[in-house]
Regions:
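Transmembrane beta-barrel architecture of outer-membrane proteins
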Residues: 11-13, 59, 104, 224-226, ...
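Amphipathic alpha-helical coiled-coil segments
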Residues: 49-75, 83-85, 90, 126, ...
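Residues on the lipid-exposed face of transmembrane beta-strands in outer-membrane beta-barrel proteins
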Residues: 16-20, 130, 229-233, 332
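Small/polar (Gly/Ser/Thr/Ala-rich) solvent-exposed segments
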Residues: 2-9, 19-48, 178, 197-225, ...
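Periplasmic alpha-helical coiled-coil/stalk elements that build and connect Gram-negative outer-membrane
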Residues: 49-169, 273-276, 280, 322
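Bacterial Sec-pathway N-terminal export signals of envelope proteins
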Residues: 11, 17, 21-22, 150-184, ...
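Short, charged, amphipathic alpha-helical segments
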Residues: 33-36, 99-108, 312-320
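Long amphipathic alpha-helical coiled-coil segments
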Residues: 129-137, 342-352
Length: 356
């Protein structure tokens, strides 16, 4: 017995093929390395942005501490002037001083209230600056007028730095320089990848194929395996490969120039930060000594005035000098702490809060 199947006007085929590049003139490997280096460069760029943000937050926090301490200085100044006014008023009532001295004391007290009001407003503004640096926002009604409490004081803790060591640390640790070094290596790999266009490529392939015949019988089909090696080589491409190589080399040279420029900028930043640190150190040491002398001057002026050998002008002048000395000391401590943080950042060191 025989069975026949009618002819069909449809044929179909299934083909599964896999290939693997064996040799591509180093292009594939260079492309993978280049992509990895670019990814690493992006991570270093993020690290640099984080360092900048942390420095901004630390500087803003020091600004809050400075503004808060200035309020204390102005409050102490006002308290001393009020005590002096009370002393003058008592003497005026006793008839030992003129109304002029009493009036002068009242004017001094009134004038002392102005910088206190300014200091309190500066404190509120410093908090807003810190809030912006932190990216902190709140729409709660109860928090709009609330002033947060800040822990810490504006202290002077001497730290030693050496200029040559700072240069070395900056060249090694700065994420901006590391990023450009990664990009330079990536551009070198891009040149290698571009050169691979002038070299042959060799690939191994294998596959399986099923082809259906021209009848409705499923047995009317053929299938089989295929394994082989193939090669391609663009002998002439209108100098397209040469153009890509030239372009890749141009980008490489631009990246190298950018790296050199960044290294010079980092060196200048280290020098500037180191100079500011030196200045801040000298000012902090000097202001500490002057404040002690100004406090002693106020004590002696009050003693001489109470003994009748000094004048009210001596007391007021000494008090002004003390307030100026205390303010300068706070400003010097603030400048020193900011200078240390800026120098650490210029050297590529992470913020102390991160390292600790």
């Amino acid at each position: 017995l025989a069975q026949s199947f009618p002819a069909s006007d449809r044929t179909w085929a299934i083909s599964l093929t896999a290939s693997q590049v064996i040799y591509a003139g180093g292009g594939v490997r260079s492309s993978v390395k280049s992509s990895t280096l670019v990814r690493d460069a992006a991570e270093l760029d993020l690290k640099a942005a984080i360092n900048d943000a942390l420095l901004g937050v630390r500087t803003a926090f020091y600004g809050v501490l400075l503004s808060r301490e200035k309020i204390t200085v102005q409050e102490k100044n006002l308290d001393l002037l009020q005590q002096q006014l009370k002393n003058v008023t008592d003497r005026f009532n006793a008839g030992t001083v003129s109304s002029f001295e009493k009036l002068r004391g009242e004017v001094a007290v009134a004038n002392a209230k102005v910088p206190l009001i300014t200091a309190r407003n500066d404190y509120r503004l410093a908090i807003e600056t810190l809030r912006q640096a932190l990216g902190f926002t709140t729409n709660k009604q109860e928090s709009l007028r609330k002033i947060p409490d800040f822990i810490g004081t504006l202290d002077y803790a001497p730290v030693s730095f050496e200029l040559q060591s700072a240069f070395t640390a900056a060249q090694v640790n700065r994420p901006e320089l590391q990023r450009l070094a990664k990009l330079t290596s990536a551009r070198e790999e891009s040149v290698t990848a571009a050169k691979s266009g002038a070299k042959p490529t060799v690939s191994a392939f294998g596959g399986w194929q099923l082809r259906k015949g021209g009848t409705n019988s499923f047995s009317d089909s053929n299938d089989g395996w295929l394994v082989g090696v193939q090669s391609q080589w663009a002998i002439f491409d209108g100098r397209a490969t040469a153009g890509r190589v030239s372009q890749a080399r141009s980008v490489l040279e631009q990246t190298k120039l950018t790296l050199t420029e960044a290294q010079l900028a980092a060196e200048v930043e280290v020098r500037r930060a180191f100079s500011q640190w030196q200045q801040a150190t000298e000012l902090a040491d000097a202001s500490k000594l002057v404040t002690g002398q100004a406090e002693e001057s106020v004590r002696l002026a009050n003693a001489r005035y109470n003994a009748g050998t000094g004048t009210q002008l001596d007391v007021l002048s000494a008090q002004v000098d003390l307030t100026t000395a205390r303010t300068n000391q706070l400003q010097a401590y603030y400048a020193y702490n900011v200078a240390v943080a800026s120098l650490r950042k210029a050297m590529g060191q992470a913020d102390e809060f991160v390292t600790n």
